[in-house]
UniProtKB/Swiss-Prot annotation:
Protein name: High mobility group B protein 7
Species of origin: Arabidopsis thaliana
Domain of life: Eukaryota
Compositionally biased tracts (Polar residues): 1-11, 20-29
InterPro entries in alphabetical order: HMG_box_dom, HMG_box_dom_sf
Length: 241
C-alpha cells in the first residue's frame, strides 16, 4: 500500500502583515498659534475652525448668508401675517359685552315709516272666524281653528266672500295712499337734506375765503413792517455819514 501524500497534508504558508506602528498612525491636530481650534479670518473677521480653514471662502459665505437672511425675512413676514389676522380673537383681555337692545329700540328699528301691508280677504275672514270659534269651543287648539276655518272658507260662495273681498280692497286702497304720502315725505326730506348740504358748503366756502383774506392782510402788514424797517436802517446809515 502506498503511503499518504505529504503535499496534501502540508500546512499552507501564511502571509505576515506588519501592524502599523504608532509613529505611522499618529495624526497631527491643527491648531492656531495660540493653541485654539479656531482662527480669525482676516477677510471677513470671522472665527473659522482651523481644520476647515482650507475650505473657507469669504465671498461664498457672504452669498449664503444673504440668501439665508432673505429666506428668514420672508418666513418671518409670512408668520407675522397670521397673528395679525387673529389678533382680535386671541386677545387676552375680556371681550366687551354687546349692549342688548331694549324692546323700544327693537320696535323702532324693526318698524319703519312704511305702513304695514293690508290683510287679504282670507285673513279678514279668519280673524272673525277665530273669535266665534273660541267662544263656541272653549279650550280648543289654534291648529283646529285654522284647519276648520280654511275648510269653511273654501265652502263659501262668491257672494259670501264678497264682503271680505270688499274690505280687503278698501284696506289696499288706504295702503296705497299711505305709501304715496310716505314717498312724498321722503322726497321732501331728501330735498331738505340736499339744501342743508348746499348751505353748509356755501358757509364753508365763505369761511375759507375769509381765512384767505386774513392771511393776505397779515402778509401785507408784514411787508409794510419790513419796508419800514429798511427805511429806518437807511436813515440811520445816512445819519452816520
Amino acid at each position: 500500500m502506498a503511503g499518504p501524500s505529504t503535499t496534501s497534508n502540508a500546512p499552507k504558508q501564511r502571509k505576515r502583515v506588519e501592524a502599523e506602528t504608532s509613529s505611522n498612525t499618529s495624526t497631527t491636530l491643527r491648531r492656531a498659534k495660540d493653541g485654539s481650534a479656531f482662527a480669525l479670518c482676516e477677510g471677513c473677521n470671522k472665527s473659522v475652525a482651523v481644520a476647515l480653514i482650507s475650505m473657507h471662502n469669504c465671498s461664498l459665505d457672504a452669498k449664503i448668508r444673504v440668501n439665508l437672511e432673505a429666506q428668514v425675512v420672508e418666513t418671518q413676514a409670512e408668520a407675522k401675517k397670521k397673528p395679525a389676522e387673529k389678533k382680535k380673537t386671541t386677545s387676552d383681555g375680556p371681550k366687551p359685552k354687546r349692549l342688548k337692545k331694549t324692546n323700544d329700540e327693537k320696535k323702532s328699528s324693526s318698524t319703519s315709516n312704511k305702513p304695514k301691508r293690508p290683510l287679504t280677504a282670507f285673513f279678514i275672514f279668519m280673524s272673525d272666524f277665530r273669535k266665534t270659534f273660541k267662544s263656541e269651543h272653549n279650550g280648543s287648539l289654534a291648529k283646529d281653528a285654522a284647519k276648520i276655518g280654511g275648510e269653511k272658507w273654501k265652502s263659501l260662495t262668491e257672494e259670501e266672500k264678497k264682503v271680505y273681498l270688499d274690505k280687503a280692497a278698501e284696506l289696499k286702497a288706504e295702503y296705497n295712499k299711505s305709501l304715496e304720502s310716505n314717498d312724498a315725505d321722503e322726497e321732501e326730506e331728501d330735498e331738505e337734506k340736499q339744501s342743508d348740504d348746499v348751505d353748509d358748503a356755501e358757509e364753508k366756502q365763505v369761511d375759507d375765503d375769509d381765512e384767505v383774506e386774513e392771511k393776505e392782510v397779515e402778509n401785507t402788514d408784514d411787508d409794510k413792517k419790513e419796508a419800514e424797517g429798511k427805511e429806518e436802517e437807511e436813515e440811520e446809515i445816512l445819519d452816520d455819514y
